[in-house]
């Protein structure tokens, strides 16, 4: 109503949508942007896993009003922790910097804060590590694609599962390689996980769905059959590509 979306249960206006480029694979962001424009929704991209991934020639994280990147220790590049926010909105960028610096107001000697905020600034030593990592990003991405290609070839003849490849028209960084069972089967998924770990291969399931976690049990929800099926079907497989650095 009034050109905006509202939650039919609570009546609250829905102001933003947060799409995620899961495992580094770009989602259908252009279609989502069109829907967001129709209903006056702000798009905040979760690009934590997708540095180096593209839709056509456009990098993920540059479609919405802002986006987040992760530089956690397990990501494609790392600063040891933390991340970055991308935006081309100068006013928003200044607001983010202010809140990430304890909302401290300029003053010769007083400590004056004009908002509830936290100290989220990245230490210089971590930023220096990040700059060094960025200089090798192309090498890391190439190695990731070599590994993904080998996985795709290896699973091409599998009958009960398939390798999850980048969507058509996109370039994925293949941050976390994944296989998908052809039919959702929690027992088979767990059997494969146990067998892989027993053989020395560190594999894991996809995350538990948020609406199934105890702290969200009272939150509004809808039926999510696609998410449920994926949870029962996906297995993340070893994704370190260090052995393929320098290969193409």
Sequence positions of predicted segments:
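Conserved active-site segment immediately N-terminal to the catalytic lysine
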Residues: 16, 45-79, 108-114, 162
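Glycine-rich, phosphate-binding/catalytic loops in enzymes
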Residues: 34-37, 60-61
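Hydrophobic "anchor" residues on beta-strands that sit immediately upstream
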Residues: 41-42
């Amino acid at each position: 109503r009034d050109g905006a979306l509202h939650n039919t249960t609570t009546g609250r206006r829905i102001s933003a949508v947060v799409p995620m480029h899961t495992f580094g694979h770009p989602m259908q962001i252009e279609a989502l942007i069109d829907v967001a424009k129709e209903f006056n929704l702000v798009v905040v991209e979760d690009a934590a896993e997708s540095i180096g991934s593209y839709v056509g020639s456009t990098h993920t994280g540059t479609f919405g009003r802002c986006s987040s990147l992760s530089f956690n220790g397990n990501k494609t590049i790392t600063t040891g922790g933390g991340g970055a926010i991308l935006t081309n909105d100068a006013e928003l960028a200044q607001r983010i910097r202010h809140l990430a610096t304890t909302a401290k107001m300029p003053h010769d000697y007083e400590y004056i804060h004009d908002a509830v905020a936290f100290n989220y600034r990245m230490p210089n030593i971590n930023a220096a590590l990040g700059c060094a990592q960025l200089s090798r990003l192309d090498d890391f991405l190439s190695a990731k694609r070599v590994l993904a290609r080998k996985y795709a070839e290896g699973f091409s003849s599998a009958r009960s599962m398939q390798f999850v490849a980048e969507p058509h028209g996109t370039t994925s960084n293949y941050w976390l390689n994944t296989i998908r069972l052809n039919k959702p089967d929690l027992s088979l998924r767990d059997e494969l996980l146990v067998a892989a770990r027993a053989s020395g291969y560190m594999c894991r399931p996809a995350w538990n769905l948020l609406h199934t976690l105890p702290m969200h049990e009272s939150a509004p929800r809808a039926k999510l059959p696609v998410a449920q099926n994926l949870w029962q079907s996906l297995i993340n497989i070893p994704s370190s590509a260090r052995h393929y650095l320098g290969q193409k």
